[in-house]
Amino acid sequence: MGNSALKAHLETSQKTGVFQLTGKGLTEFPEDLQKLTANLRTVDLSNNKIEELPAFIGSFQHLKSFTISCNKLTSLPNDIGKLKKLETLILNGNQLKQLPSSIGQLKSLRTLSLSGNQFKEFPSGLGTLRQLDVLDLSKNQIRVVPAEVAELQAIEINLNQNQISSVTQEVSRTPRLKVLRLEENCLELSSIPLSILTDSQVSLLSVEGNLFEVKKMRDLEGYDKYMERFTATKKKFA
């Protein structure tokens, strides 16, 4: 991409607060964006070949939405935790295996999407994200849903297409959790904690494509209670 084209993009972004440059084969985060740290509210650099984010990413104090899906990121800099106004962070289709501890400082974050990365463990340190509504960890290699999931404020957690064979009982204590997606994992019927059915807020539990027939769920203790929540939610949105 030529300098003049980039310059035109930057000039437009200065006015709009939006910088979108997708599918251009970029191998580096555009350094010229440093000039717009005071302006930018939305950045989308999806479908490029960017391997790392610069430390100056932390200086975009007004950034609300950052999408950098389908690149080649293997890690994130600690400075990403400085984005105090960030509400949406989309990192799908990279090569991330873990998150920096500073991610827990993103106090405004509502959506964190990490689908299609290389996580083998459920990322830790997300319990401090008090505004988090949606956490997408689908298409990774996670095997266990650990007890610390109970610390999350998320309303929806998507764990479809992992390698999960174990789900903690504590998941029922996740205070705002309404939607739990566990499709296409390695779960036996006996691995589903009954407390999700009997004692949680979950009104949509999707478990298709595991090692049991979904209709066998009907025989589990607490299934009727779960169905009451499921039906009530459906009526609300009908």
From Swiss-Prot:
In the record for this protein, the LRR repeats are positioned at 10-36, 37-62, 64-82, 83-106, 108-128, 129-152, 154-173, 174-199
Entry-linked Gene3D superfamilies = Ribonuclease Inhibitor (3.80.10.10)
KW Repeat (keyword) present: yes
Family matches, as SMART domains: LRR_BAC (SM00364), LRR_TYP (SM00369)
Recite the UniProt keywords alphabetically: Leucine-rich repeat, Repeat
The organism's place on the tree of life at top rank: Eukaryota
Pfam families, sorted: LRR_14 (PF23598)
PROSITE patterns reported in the protein's UniProt record: LRR
Keyword Repeat tagged: yes
PANTHER family documented for this protein:
LEUCINE-RICH REPEAT-CONTAINING PROTEIN 57 (PTHR48051:SF62), PTHR48051
UniProt-recorded name of the protein: Leucine-rich repeat-containing protein 57
Q: Which organism is it from?
A: Danio rerio (Zebrafish)
